[in-house]
Amino acid sequence: MFFKTLKEAFKVKDVRARILFTIFILFVFRLGAHITVPGVNVQNLTEVSNLPFLNMMNLVSGNAMQNYSLFAMGVSPYITASIIVQLLQMDILPKFVEWSKQGEIGRRKLNQATRYITLVLAMAQSIGITAGFQAMSSLNIVQNPNWQSYLMIGAILTTGSMVVTWMGEQINEKGFGSGVSVIIFAGIVSSIPSAVKSVYDEKFLNVRPSEIPMSWLFVIGLVLSAIIIIYVTTFVQQAERKVPIQYTKLTQGAPTSSYLPLRVNPAGVIPVIFAGSITTAPATILQFLQRSQGSNVGWLSTLQDALSYTTWTGMLFYALLIVLFTFFYSFVQVNPEKMAENLQKQGSYIPSVRPGKGTEKYVSRLLMRLATVGALFLGLISIIPIAAQNVWGLPKIVALGGTSLLILIQVAIQAVKQLEGYLLKRKYAGFMDNPLETK
């Protein structure tokens, strides 16, 4: 189905241009992920670049952090900045609340604020991680460890992060899919070969012949688990609750009734990405403090455990963040107040529900139930592989396997739907003012 849609899409000039533009941007992203930042000893990075709290950053950047490349920070600062801006719109800063109600003009102001916050966070996080790596390693990671070197490396990494953010915006405007999600998708896909190699090395190289059958059983189990996760995730991500609506006034050609689709998981995979980004920066600071203060500082160890996927406390904290962000982002994606207002303006209503405040309360209750299902789903899919890796000592690929598949499937579904939308537009191009060009 996907390949058939892709084949049809390539026949449309505008769609073909968007696909090729997206591929070009992703090529530049992957190129930058292999260019190491000047002033860093890459060969000394192995000791610290595989720390558990950096797994998420390595995942979304396609191992760019492991190489300490130009794009090592990836979109993590932008994601954190987006969370901050969305929180500030919730009656915290009046100016941000005002902008959120100004339509397109307000959206531009909020985007600009997000960029400024991204710049500050990227600089702070870049210098912090560089200094932290230097403190945690027994070898010199920074060739000349002085404040000028830290500032230079921080500036380069910050520039790289801003460039990646700009790439995401360009994909939004001229390419396919949500820019940030597509870049994360590319990072995960690029990590697959190295992940497969690590499983092969661990399970098939330098093992006794008697252990080979168990290795094959592990691989079969891993593949079957991935298939199950793909099937369940695809089903849940596309499932929706259809809320019937009716029209108070009939106009020529208008339907007498319709429905309002609410997704079973309104937040998508954004909560998982948010939770991973939130845990990365504090964990870096704690690692740095613990190495500089000594390993016997109890409160530092406790906090570090709370942010590490390798402990049960850390897993529960990660799951809690996913649940909280699922509820938060569900109400960001589907605003009950605005939805009730729009229905009333359109002269439509939900049967047996009073328009206005009654509709708002009804949608809020329904959204809360759907978000609960979505939170449980995202939490389980993300946590079960991590727990399995911790209990049975499975390869690292397993720990974030659920998260990776969630993101890959969601981005793929969005891309297919967008392609189908363009093809549908082409089908009815004869009824539109600006039909899409072919050939």
From Swiss-Prot:
PROSITE patterns assigned: SECY_1, SECY_2
Keywords noted in UniProt: Cell membrane, Membrane, Protein transport, Translocation, Transmembrane, Transmembrane helix, Transport
Recorded topology in the membrane: Multi-pass membrane protein
Localization: Cell membrane
Record Pfam families: SecY
One annotated GO biological process: protein transport by the Sec complex
Disulfide bond among keywords: no
Chief subcellular location: membrane
Gene3D superfamilies reported in the protein's UniProt record: SecY subunit domain
GO CC annotations on file: plasma membrane
Transmembrane segments: 19-39, 68-88, 116-136, 151-171, 176-196, 216-236, 269-289, 312-332, 373-393, 396-416
InterPro entries: SecY (IPR026593), SecY/SEC61-alpha (IPR002208), SecY_CS (IPR030659), SecY_dom_sf (IPR023201)
PANTHER family reported in the protein's UniProt record: SECY/SEC61-ALPHA FAMILY MEMBER
NCBIfam families: 3a0501s007
Function: The central subunit of the protein translocation channel SecYEG. Consists of two halves formed by TMs 1-5 and 6-10. These two domains form a lateral gate at the front which open onto the bilayer between TMs 2 and 7, and are clamped together by SecE at the back. The channel is closed by both a pore ring composed of hydrophobic SecY resides and a short helix (helix 2A) on the extracellular side of the membrane which forms a plug. The plug probably moves laterally to allow the channel to open. The ring and the pore may move independently.
Summary of subunit composition and partner proteins: Component of the Sec protein translocase complex. Heterotrimer consisting of SecY, SecE and SecG subunits. The heterotrimers can form oligomers, although 1 heterotrimer is thought to be able to translocate proteins. Interacts with the ribosome. Interacts with SecDF, and other proteins may be involved. Interacts with SecA.
Assigned protein family: Belongs to the SecY/SEC61-alpha family.
Name of the protein: Protein translocase subunit SecY
Species per Swiss-Prot/TrEMBL record: Lactococcus lactis subsp. lactis (strain IL1403)
Lineage, top ranks: Bacteria, Bacillati, Bacillota, Bacilli, Lactobacillales
